[in-house]
């Protein structure tokens, strides 16, 4: 018996250790089933919200354009009508935000990041309707805003709504479903499930609490929201630019150069956004009437610009395939780029309910196409296709501004269905991110959140300072 025990002892000990490790790993994964079920519910709700919001914006825009088309032959009518309709739609969005849910202004993504750190409140009962209806107004007016910011915020708020409705008390459930809604919202906005997952894991890395529960919940929510989106809209790529040729290896240095350019552009772009936000705060000074009036003027301006040069306004998704196909000259591309930079800064910096993803992707496409056409002119021996630089530029500006290169790469590849361009995308986005970091630029959403928290603390300090001091006078008795 002693001999047998001594012979089996080393193997038995090793086997026992492996068994304990496996049991510990299995027992550690005590994922509450209710959280995973609720994650699926959050994904379905967010997907339905995304489809409704997308179709609602399209309907409002179509009705506005149809009304203008009916009076297109009457110049004395079409110009005033274009201004008035867009102004009224925009004013509705600004009014709802300023009067009922100030946290619904702007993109909304920084609000979700703040909520994940328990620094910002989540009032879903007012944010969801205000963001939905207000977004219909501002985006329907033709302002240079995107649909993805509202979808991320409404998705995150939907997650918190499910938590409150089903009375899930655990902090893990509250955090996981908030992140799930945000990821599902981005997935539903762009039909890009992997980008939705990466956005939460990479861009919100400082706020997201990594655990088996939260990762599973995010995956399930993104899957269900994507299924809902594709059930109603089909499985085609959201931006159809056709299949582009792969980039030859001897042209990769040009993509690195493009990334360097976009790194600098991203830092400057972010700085201009912050300056524009400060400028509008000085203009309205917190007075909601002035803010609504400013919003009406901006909306009316976009309505007029839509008649003059439609490519200068709108989210930009319709412009991307046209620009990537090389239908504009270099001079026209630069003109559109400058015009859209100005309109993007004005619309987003004013605090209108709407995102900046889509306008940013359009800007990257335009400048990338201009760079590609220039390279094709100076280096004809490479046989360059300008569209590949358009796709690379689309992700590069996002990577430099938001500081999430992996999300930018995957998002653009999923949206355009051009996965063969992954190598030039990596070179361009990594170069843009490194240059932006070297120049000291701050990630866009993190910087906006920091500014919001600073204003929150300042307002709190002002309230405390204005409270009357209570004097403790000694009580005397007889």
From Swiss-Prot:
**Bilayer-crossing regions:** 33-69, 77-100, 124-141, 148-166, 215-232, 253-281, 288-309, 330-349, 355-376, 422-438
Q: Which residues lie on this side of the membrane: Cytoplasmic?
A: 1-32, 117-123, 167-176, 202-214, 282-287, 439-478
Q: Which reaction does it catalyse?
A: 2 chloride(in) + H(+)(out) = 2 chloride(out) + H(+)(in)
Location of the motif Selectivity filter part_1: 106-110
One Gene Ontology cellular component: plasma membrane
Coiled-coil annotation: which residues? none
Asked if the Swiss-Prot or TrEMBL record annotates the protein with the keyword Transmembrane, the reply is yes
Alphabetically, the GO molecular function entries are: antiporter activity; voltage-gated chloride channel activity
| PANTHER family per UniProt | CHLORIDE CHANNEL PROTEIN
Per the record, the similarity remark reads:
Belongs to the chloride channel (TC 2.A.49) family. ClcA subfamily.
Complex formation? Homodimer.
Function of the molecule: Proton-coupled chloride transporter. Functions as antiport system and exchanges two chloride ions for 1 proton. Probably acts as an electrical shunt for an outwardly-directed proton pump that is linked to amino acid decarboxylation, as part of the extreme acid resistance (XAR) response.
Instruction: Report what the protein is called.
Output: H(+)/Cl(-) exchange transporter ClcA
Origin organism is Yersinia pseudotuberculosis serotype O:1b (strain IP 31758)
Gene symbol here is clcA
């Amino acid at each position: 018996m002693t001999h047998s025990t001594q012979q089996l002892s080393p193997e038995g000990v090793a086997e026992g250790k492996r068994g304990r490790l496996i049991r510990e790993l299995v027992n550690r994964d005590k994922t509450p089933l209710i959280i995973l079920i609720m994650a699926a519910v959050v994904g379905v709700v967010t997907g339905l919200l995304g489809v409704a919001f997308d179709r609602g914006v399209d309907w409002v825009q179509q009705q506005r354009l149809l009304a203008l088309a009916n009076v297109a032959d009457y110049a004395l009518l079409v110009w005033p009508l274009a201004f008035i309709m867009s102004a009224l739609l925009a004013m509705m969005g600004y009014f709802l935000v300023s009067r009922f849910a100030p946290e619904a202004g702007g993109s909304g993504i920084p609000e979700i990041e703040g909520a994940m750190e328990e620094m910002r409140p989540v009032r879903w009962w007012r944010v969801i309707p205000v963001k939905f209806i207000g977004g219909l107004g501002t985006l329907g007016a033709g302002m240079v805003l995107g649909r993805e910011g509202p979808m991320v915020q409404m998705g995150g708020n939907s997650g918190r709504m499910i938590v409150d409705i089903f009375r899930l008390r655990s902090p893990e459930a509250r955090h996981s479903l908030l992140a799930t809604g945000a990821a599902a919202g981005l997935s539903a906005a762009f039909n890009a499930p992997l980008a939705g997952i990466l956005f939460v894991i990479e861009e919100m890395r400082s706020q997201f609490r990594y655990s088996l529960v939260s990762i599973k919940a995010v995956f399930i929510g993104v899957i269900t929201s994507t299924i809902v989106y594709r059930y109603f809209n089909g499985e085609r790529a959201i931006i159809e630019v056709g299949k582009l040729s792969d980039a030859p290896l001897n042209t990769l240095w040009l993509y690195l150069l493009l990334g360097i350019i976009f790194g600098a552009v991203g830092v400057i772009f972010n700085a201009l956004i912050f300056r524009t936000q400060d400028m509008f705060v000085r203009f309205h000074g917190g007075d909601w009437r002035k803010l609504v009036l400013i919003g009406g003027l901006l909306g009316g301006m976009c309505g007029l610009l839509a008649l003059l040069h439609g490519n200068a306004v709108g989210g930009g998704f319709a412009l991307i395939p046209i620009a990537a196909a090389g239908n504009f000259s270099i001079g026209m591309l630069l003109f559109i780029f400058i015009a859209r930079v100005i309109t993007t800064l004005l619309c987003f910096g004013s605090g209108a309910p709407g995102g900046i993803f889509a306008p940013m992707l359009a800007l990257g496409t335009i400048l990338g196409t201009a760079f590609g056409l220039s390279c094709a002119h100076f280096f004809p021996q490479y046989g360059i296709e300008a569209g590949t630089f358009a796709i690379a530029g689309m992700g590069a500006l996002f990577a430099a501004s938001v500081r999430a290169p992996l999300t930018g790469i995957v998002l653009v590849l999923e949206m355009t269905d051009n996965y063969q361009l992954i190598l030039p995308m990596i070179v361009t986005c990594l170069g843009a991110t490194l240059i932006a970091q070297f120049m000291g630029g701050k990630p866009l959403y993190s910087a906006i959140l920091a500014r919001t928290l600073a204003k929150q603390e300042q307002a709190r300090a002002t309230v405390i300072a204005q409270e009357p001091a209570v004097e403790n006078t000694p009580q005397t008795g007889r």
